[in-house]
Regions:
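Sec/Tat signal peptide C-region and signal peptidase I cleavage site
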Residues: 17-21
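Acidic/histidine-rich, surface-exposed loop or edge segments in extracytoplasmic proteins
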Residues: 22-30, 59-68
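Bacterial N-terminal signal peptides that target proteins for export
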Residues: 1-7
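Bacterial N-terminal signal peptides
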Residues: 8-15
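C-terminal partner/receptor-binding element of secreted or periplasmic proteins
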Residues: 112-137
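N-terminal targeting signals for Sec/Tat export/insertion, comprising classic cleavable signal peptides
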Residues: 30-57
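Mid-chain, structured segments of secreted extracytoplasmic proteins
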Residues: 61-110
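Loop/turn elements at helix/coil->beta-strand transitions in domains of secreted/extracellular proteins
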Residues: 22-24, 51-55, 88-92, 130-133
Length: 137
């Protein structure tokens, strides 16, 4: 019986270790004009070095603007293709619904890669509680 408990504990430890082997990372964007392109570039570089990282981008306030349909950054660079390429690599993009309400925005104004969260700030806190690294470009 004692041997079975040891094996069960070893299996649980191995499973926990393999889960934690994947880095959890949160990118916080609250101003698209100054953080949007820089953040997307950082995320691309992050995944180029560590393709197993699980990355979530949480946007609120003016940060949600980068996920609008037809949104463009500095130099007229379109955000949508950059976001789509990162989404294809497993990156999650989330828009704060409180921002939608406060700015009278509709979900239909956002690209299809955008997901939604009731509160960007609460989502950031929960991701950090789960052990995600916090990066603000």
């Amino acid at each position: 019986m004692r041997g079975k408990k040891f094996v069960a504990a070893a299996v649980l430890f191995a499973a926990t270790t393999s889960i934690r082997a994947q880095d959890l990372v949160t990118y916080h964007i609250d101003h698209a004009a100054t953080q949007g392109l820089k953040g997307l570039r950082n995320i691309r570089n992050h995944l180029d070095v560590d393709p197993t990282a699980k990355i979530t981008v949480v946007t609120h306030a003016q940060g949600v603007d980068m996920l609008f349909v037809d949104a463009k950054g500095e130099g007229g660079i379109e955000y949508a293709p950059l976001v789509a390429a990162l989404r294809a690599r497993g990156v999650e993009f989330e828009v704060c619904e409180i921002t939608l309400k406060n700015r009278d925005l509709k979900k239909t104004q956002f690209i299809q890669e955008a997901g939604f969260t009731p509160s960007g700030v609460v989502r950031l806190a929960k991701l950090q509680k789960q052990g995600a690294a916090y990066i603000k470009p």
